[in-house]
């Protein structure tokens, strides 16, 4: 039986632990809060996230990373993107020599503009054949209640991708494989920024035409950056590109969209940060993404305006006006 460690017990980590167990793995979920671990072991629920969803008996929890990682052949990482490097400094020495790291994170490291798989490779000292990325339209709440969904498992190693695919294939989650790790990660990171903009539109009271235009043009700037970095353009038409973008921009379950909606209603960045418990990755990813784009001469006007709203105090309506007043041009350009 496959043994998986999932770190940590946030909403997506908890749900993915359920997925792995439903697919037949023995799972140890690391919860920093011992009370959460005790509740999972005693009542089979995570009382902080998804308290009404029963976890399988194959899911056990611990507040000890050493116990969680002992004998694990899959190490699933579900932590805030900006905390990943410091977490791996502590955890990587506890990981077995043949274990595969699986990233559930969709963000970019501030300062370095590195993708999560790059941070794992550097901080844990492992090759790309031991790293996989899971990305797609995967709102945790919907998967928790077993609404049918699909996802992508990307790895530089076909064997690794297929192994992780088999480990998370259930009657309600259908995983596909992809060799384009860069494209899958980039799609997940940029869509969080676009979802912030989608929330702003909702908060300002705009309608379906506005949202559809934003999603489509957001996909265009994602593809421009991805192509410049060497990603496969087809990736952005798939689950890790368009699929993730549609789900995150359109659902009230999306924390990035919810965050943006509050900005659109007039709250400041500091006010929303103080109110919203869960991490909105797009807030921290927009600047690293822009640094990448600027270095390559790639235009990302939506991401630029989101950054201005977040960090320069630009009113969201002014950001919309700026986007709409840009010089017209062809729809397709690289």
From Swiss-Prot:
Catalytic reactions of this protein: sn-glycerol 3-phosphate + NAD(+) = dihydroxyacetone phosphate + NADH + H(+); sn-glycerol 3-phosphate + NADP(+) = dihydroxyacetone phosphate + NADPH + H(+)
Subcellular location: Cytoplasm
SUPFAM superfamilies: 6-phosphogluconate dehydrogenase C-terminal domain-like, NAD(P)-binding Rossmann-fold domains
Main location, first listed in the record: cytoplasm
A molecular function (GO) term: glycerol-3-phosphate dehydrogenase [NAD(P)+] activity
Active site (record annotation): 191
Pathway info: Membrane lipid metabolism; glycerophospholipid metabolism
GO biological process, one term: glycerol-3-phosphate biosynthetic process
Entry-linked Gene3D superfamilies: N-(1-d-carboxylethyl)-l-norvaline Dehydrogenase, domain 2, NAD(P)-binding Rossmann-like Domain
Positions of sn-glycerol 3-phosphate binding: 106, 136, 191, 244, 254-256
Keywords per UniProt: Cytoplasm, Lipid biosynthesis, Lipid metabolism, NAD, NADP, Nucleotide-binding, Oxidoreductase, Phospholipid biosynthesis, Phospholipid metabolism
Positions contributing to NADPH binding: 11-12, 32, 106, 140, 255, 279, 281
EC number: 1.1.1.94
Gene Ontology CC terms: cytosol
Pfam annotation, one family: NAD_Gly3P_dh_C
Family under the similarity heading: Belongs to the NAD-dependent glycerol-3-phosphate dehydrogenase family.
Alphabetized NCBIfam families for the sequence: PRK00094.1-2, PRK00094.1-4
Role noted for this protein: Catalyzes the reduction of the glycolytic intermediate dihydroxyacetone phosphate (DHAP) to sn-glycerol 3-phosphate (G3P), the key precursor for phospholipid synthesis.
Protein's name in the database: Glycerol-3-phosphate dehydrogenase [NAD(P)+]
Native source species: Parafrankia sp. (strain EAN1pec)
Species classification: Bacteria, Bacillati, Actinomycetota, Actinomycetes, Frankiales
């Amino acid at each position: 039986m496959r043994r998986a460690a999932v770190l940590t017990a946030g909403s997506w980590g908890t749900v993915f632990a359920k997925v792995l167990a439903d697919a037949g793995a023995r799972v140890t979920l690391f919860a920093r809060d011992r009370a959460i671990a005790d509740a999972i072991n005693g009542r089979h629920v995570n009382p902080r996230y998804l308290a009404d969803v029963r976890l399988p008996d194959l899911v056990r929890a611990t507040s000890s990373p050493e116990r969680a990682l002992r004998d694990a052949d899959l190490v699933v990482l579900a932590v805030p993107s900006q905390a990943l490097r410091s977490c791996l400094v502590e955890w990587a020495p506890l990981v077995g020599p043949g274990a595969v790291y699986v990233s559930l994170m969709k963000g970019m490291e501030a300062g370095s503009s590195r993708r999560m798989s790059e941070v794992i490779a550097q901080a844990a000292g492992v090759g790309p054949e031991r790293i996989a990325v899971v990305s797609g339209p995967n709102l945790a709440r919907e998967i928790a209640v077993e609404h049918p969904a699909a996802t992508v498992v990307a790895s530089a190693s076909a064997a690794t991708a297929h192994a992780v695919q088999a480990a998370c294939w259930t009657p309600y989650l259908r995983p596909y494989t992809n060799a384009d790790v860069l494209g899958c990660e980039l799609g997940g990171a940029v869509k969080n920024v676009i979802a912030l903009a989608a929330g702003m539109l909702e908060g300002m009271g705009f309608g379906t035409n506005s949202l559809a235009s934003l999603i489509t043009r957001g996909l265009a700037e994602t593809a421009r950056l991805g192509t410049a970095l060497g990603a496969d353009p087809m990736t952005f038409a798939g689950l890790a590109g368009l699929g993730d973008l549609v789900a995150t921009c359109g659902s009230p379950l999306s924390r990035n969209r919810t965050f943006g909606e509050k900005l659109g209603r007039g709250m400041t960045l500091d006010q929303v940060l103080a109110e919203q418990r869960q991490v909105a990755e797009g807030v921290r990813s927009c600047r690293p993404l822009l640094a990448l784009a600027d270095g390559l001469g790639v235009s990302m006007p939506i991401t630029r305006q989101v950054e201005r709203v977040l960090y320069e105090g630009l009113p969201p309506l002014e950001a919309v006006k700026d986007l709409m007043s840009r010089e017209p041009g062809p729809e397709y350009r690289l």
